[in-house]
Amino acid sequence: MKYESIKKRIGSDKMKKIFFLLFMLILSISVSSKNLKYHPKTKEELQELIENESIYLGDIDTSAITDMSDLFIREKNKIDACGTTYEYITTKRTNFSGIGKWDTSNVTDMEGLFYKMKDFNEDISAWNTSKVENMISMFEDADSFNQSLNNWDVSKVKTMKNMFRGAISFNQPLNKWNVGEVMDMEEMFEAAYKFNQNINSWNVSKVKNMSYMFNSAKEFNQPLNNWNVSSVEDMTCMFRYTKKFNQALNSWNVSKVKYMEEMFFEAVSFNQSLNRWNVSNVKDMARMFCDAKKFNQDLSMWKVQGATDTVNMFLGSPLENRKPKWEGQ
């Protein structure tokens, strides 16, 4: 009985400490928010503060903001005096120091957040992205951005379409990301010229669209053999214009893929076996290996349907004059 009483007291003391620590944490967050100068409640209010260059971004309490989509876009579809149409005009602000301190814990939409922000390169590695579901075009055409993002929680993100498209300087590890809920990776690294990181551990089992994913990713040459692509339906131009990519893909389950048009178009280094692929559902293979200068693999075992478009499939490749013979083709 004496020992049971001691155990209860110890347990009670532990619970008190836990509750005390939680209370202090909540209190510190509350106090830190109150110490900030500005407390916008909507995206529009936040944008007004951003446009005032005398305001230090680190003084803004963003804890109430749920939508940061197109945050730094001032105008869309503007026509100037000469009749020139500008699709997007970004903020005039040039100093973004303090943005790394923002509380993004309630943000669900970050679509186009840094779109066309040519000079932006601030450290935002500490951002809480645990509620974000949309990262479409988040760093698209952010020419200078090259900061660590590997510790971000992206577990609720459903679409990363165009996320790093045209982010010509970005080359940071992303191997820790949990992309298990993502369904769309179209153009994700298109024209991300320097990106060459190992993302073979990604769970891409829910992704349906990988079209243009590495299109023009000139430096990319990392293994992808562990990817589960069994849900993917579109691989159009996936590795087009990849100058260095030459990795094993034969283990991929491509049985649901319908579109492989220009998939390896001008993938000038690629020469890996693909004989195990089940391409029975593919409708379009036009120019699939066109100008793939080194591709010289046996594809005779493929079951290509008669209605499948194979126009110029091997044009400019070593197989141009000895195309595989498939039934019905």
Describe the residue ranges of each PLM region.
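Short, Lys/Arg-enriched N-terminal segments with co-localized hydrophobic residues
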Residues: 1-14
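Sec-dependent signal peptide recognition
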Residues: 16-22
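Hydrophobic h-region of N-terminal signal peptides that target proteins for export
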Residues: 24-31
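Negatively charged
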Residues: 31-329
